[in-house]
């Protein structure tokens, strides 16, 4: 197998991009490493935002653990349901995450449901929580897509545009290669290559832009839940376009419609209507009242400046 990946029109060539790294004799997939990094950074973002908005960050550690477990399970279940032909003959392969196979929509849906239930149990505002985790979710999606890069998956149809990505045929699943890719296949130094849209890169950059927008807008939000609605609207808008470029779409059985593209379209319409309505009527909504009623910051979160060295010294001398 050949491990090089290149972006010919950008003059970028990476000669050896493996799918895993060996540490102390154990092979660890880059996909898993990236997901782990995304989770840790997401925790940091959510707890930092919780402190900024006078919430208890410990609540987010509890919800984060439940949300991550539910999210990974939901992402896998969603993927398996719409790719059942790949797993029906070997059910144990369902539990093999080393080769990827996580659907972002399934993960977000499962995580949001679990966090909503936990918020109700803890008597917290779910809308405030969703705003707090919106940037953490975007970070996870932005970084997580690079797992697709290492796995040579989630790419689009043939293209010869500026960001075209060139992959060795023997490093790609045969089922992901379309007729159009075969027609434009190149042979370089005895190796066959396909050239495709790097849709993982498009989505990662799209999420990065959305993340910057939310960071800049967060201090100007009008009601709890607005940041989360903007996240859903913006992500859905990008996904409608990007999903149309992909060749490994998860299809609705018997219909052949890309399920993620359908969900993205519904998400854009639904959140768009909600944003327009709440933009006018948020003052009469419980979501508005919760934005002005933060719980007092716990004493250990407020923090107290430690006494200076001379204050400690004189105190001990008294």
Identify the role of each PLM range.
Residues 1-318:
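A feature for loop-to-transmembrane-helix boundaries and adjacent hydrophobic helices
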């Amino acid at each position: 197998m050949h491990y090089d990946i290149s972006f010919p029109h950008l003059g970028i060539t990476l000669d050896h991009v493996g799918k895993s790294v060996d540490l102390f004799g154990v092979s660890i997939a880059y996909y898993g490493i990236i997901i782990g990094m995304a989770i840790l950074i997401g925790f940091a973002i959510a707890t930092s935002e919780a402190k900024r908005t006078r919430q208890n960050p410990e609540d987010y550690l509890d919800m984060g653990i439940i949300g991550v477990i539910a999210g990974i399970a939901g992402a896998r279940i969603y993927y398996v349901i719409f790719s059942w032909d790949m797993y029906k003959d070997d059910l144990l392969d369902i539990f093999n995450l080393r080769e990827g196979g996580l659907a972002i929509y399934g993960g977000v849906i499962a995580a949001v449901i679990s966090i909503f239930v936990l918020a109700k149990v803890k008597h917290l505002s779910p809308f405030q929580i969703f705003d707090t985790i919106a940037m953490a979710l975007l970070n996870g999606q932005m970084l997580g897509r690079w797992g697709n890069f290492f796995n040579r998956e989630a790419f689009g149809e043939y293209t010869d545009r500026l960001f075209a990505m060139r992959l060795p045929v023997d490093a790609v699943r045969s089922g992901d290669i379309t007729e159009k890719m075969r027609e434009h296949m190149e042979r370089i130094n005895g190796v066959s290559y396909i050239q495709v849209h790097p849709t993982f890169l498009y989505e990662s950059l799209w999420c990065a832009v959305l993340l910057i927008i939310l960071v800049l807008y967060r201090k100007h939000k009008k009601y709890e839940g607005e940041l989360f609605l903007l996240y859903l609207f913006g992500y859905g808008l990008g996904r409608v376009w990007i999903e149309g470029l992909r060749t490994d779409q998860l299809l609705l059985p018997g219909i052949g419609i890309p399920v993620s593209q359908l969900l993205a379209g519904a998400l854009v319409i639904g959140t768009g209507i909600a944003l327009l309505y709440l933009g006018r009527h948020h003052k009469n909504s419980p979501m508005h009242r919760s934005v002005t009623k933060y719980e007092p910051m716990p004493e250990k979160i407020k923090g107290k400046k430690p006494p200076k060295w001379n204050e400690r010294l004189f105190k001990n001398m008294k």
